[in-house]
């Protein structure tokens, strides 16, 4: 089973206030892209990339020649080959994101073809349950407190606090942000 085509499916929608600088977005609403790998036998796999279609398309221009015609059933070897071949093209950033999406899609294909859950293919289940966490943007102390309280009300007991004003205003604001998060 060979890789025939790579398709990009941009996801569009609003972004949370404070998540991105408008100068970076310039009207762009696509910050997440699905990567679809299509095989010569019609089996498809999907991978998810937290990067715009524009950047992933640019990365594909570099790595796609190493994909078309390659085995769709050996994700580890394919990902390693892509990393090796793209080393001098800017290892990291959009190229690494694109490889990640392709890797996920290839594992999806392998799971479908073998009839196995991907967790088993990756070494088996190690936990029966997982503890989900809420992901919130770091914000001014009062806004952060409101976001954390909302997450607690929705049942989350752990949080990942993303980027924001930390280190950008002053030490007093930073201390307040940490204090609110610890409460």
Q: Residue ranges of each PLM-predicted region?
A:
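General structural feature for long, well-ordered alpha-helical segments within catalytic domains
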Residues: 59, 74, 78, 98, ...
């Amino acid at each position: 089973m060979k890789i025939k085509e790579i398709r990009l499916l941009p996801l569009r929608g609003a972004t949370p206030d404070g998540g991105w600088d408008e100068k970076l977005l310039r009207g762009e609403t696509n910050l997440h892209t699905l990567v679809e790998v299509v095989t010569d036998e019609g089996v498809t796999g999907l991978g998810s990339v937290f990067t715009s279609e524009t950047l992933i398309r640019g990365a594909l221009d570099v790595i796609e020649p190493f994909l078309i015609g390659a085995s769709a059933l050996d994700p580890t070897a394919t990902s390693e080959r892509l990393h090796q071949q793209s080393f001098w093209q800017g290892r990291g950033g959009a190229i690494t994101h694109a490889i990640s999406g392709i890797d996920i899609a290839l594992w999806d294909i392998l799971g479908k073809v073998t009839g196995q859950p991907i967790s088993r293919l990756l070494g088996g289940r190690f936990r029966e349950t997982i503890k989900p966490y809420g992901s919130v943007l770091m914000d001014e102390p009062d806004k952060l407190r409101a976001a954390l309280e909302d997450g607690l009300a929705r049942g989350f007991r752990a949080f990942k606090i993303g980027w924001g004003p930390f280190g950008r205003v002053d030490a007093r604001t930073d201390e307040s942000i940490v204090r609110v998060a610890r409460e």
